[in-house]
Amino acid sequence: MVSPLAKGLFQKAIAESGSLYFPCRSLSTSHHGEETAEDLGVTFAENAGCASLAELRNLPADKLVQIADTADSGNFYKKSDEIVDGWVLPDQPLMISRRGEQNPVSVMAGFTANDGSVVALLGYAADIPDTAEAYTAEIKKRYGDLADKFLRLYPATDIDGSFYNALRDRSFGWMSESWVRHAAAVGAAAYLYYFAHIPPEGHVLAPIPGSDRQRPNGAAHGAECLYVLNDLESSPLSAEYPPTEKDFAMAEIMSDYWVAFAKAGKPEVDGLPAWKPYRNSACSYMRFEDAHAHPGENLFPGMWELMDEDVNRRLALPGVGRDYYAVGVSSPVLVVDQNYKSD
């Protein structure tokens, strides 16, 4: 979407796991105190005992993988993801999109109701306070003038639910809606979806990492994929949790929309509710739940604005770092002085 090298090579895109709007590592400039990609490469080469690119290229593939996934190599495998190299990626993807310089193709993007569960597995749920008072105090300490907005969206009346929803919105929600917003801003057809249909295994209780509490799996990360593919019975869970008539109906509806978009760049299906394109004024979206498609406008009012300001502060404040999953009581302190100006 944001690489000039891909211009004219594709006409449409579907994103079901957010977008690359978190800060990427740069080739030769350090950000947030992290190593540059070149520094990582030097450490990796030293650990491999190679003094040149030619020597690295002569290493067997299995040896490269073995060396890459070690602490001595700076965990190269885990850190050498997308690199702003000035060629494939000329700048941070978020900044390219905010300037309207991305490839203007049709876009469909969205997220699930319990997308936050996959982020919780990274360890952030261990920080959830036990009381409403402690939760509120942590939010006020970390968010300052944004605390009231945060608490309206993620109240202390349901601490676990609020924390999971904040994880969802901070990552997949904000990223997905940002993607369609930026596409719409350059005149491309853009469509936002929200998957809240509970799959058969969604009622199973799952432990909250770092605690002795549990909550239902719900519509977890990736739960929409088998519905989109209309292939529910291929799930390894289908024997223990067989799909119901509602599940099959939901799969038929979603796959019809996705196929229509893949064919023509518009999810228009005869006999199904009209899926309006996202506009930054109306913020149209489609919610998939209980075997039906429900068109709506302005999903989670105030969420995108709060999370976008959260991003701006992380980018502007020194020492905050690039860990964008840390949200709520796990967030860095985002309090700013009166001279701060948002993008």
Q: What spans do the regions from the language model cover?
A:
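Ligand-binding beta-strand-loop-alpha-helix segment within the catalytic cores
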Residues: 48
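Primarily recognizes the serine-hydrolase "nucleophile elbow" in alpha/beta-hydrolase
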Residues: 1-24
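C-terminal catalytic lobe of FAD-dependent flavoproteins
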Residues: 254
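Active-site-proximal cap/loop segments of hydrolase catalytic domains
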Residues: 16-34, 41-44
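Generic structural signal for alpha-helix termini and adjacent loop/cap motifs
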Residues: 3-4, 231, 261-268
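Mature extracytoplasmic/periplasmic domains
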Residues: 268-296
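Tryptophan-rich aromatic "cage" segments
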Residues: 291-343
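Substrate-gating cap/lid region and adjacent catalytic-acid/histidine neighborhood
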Residues: 25-27, 51, 55-248, 257, ...
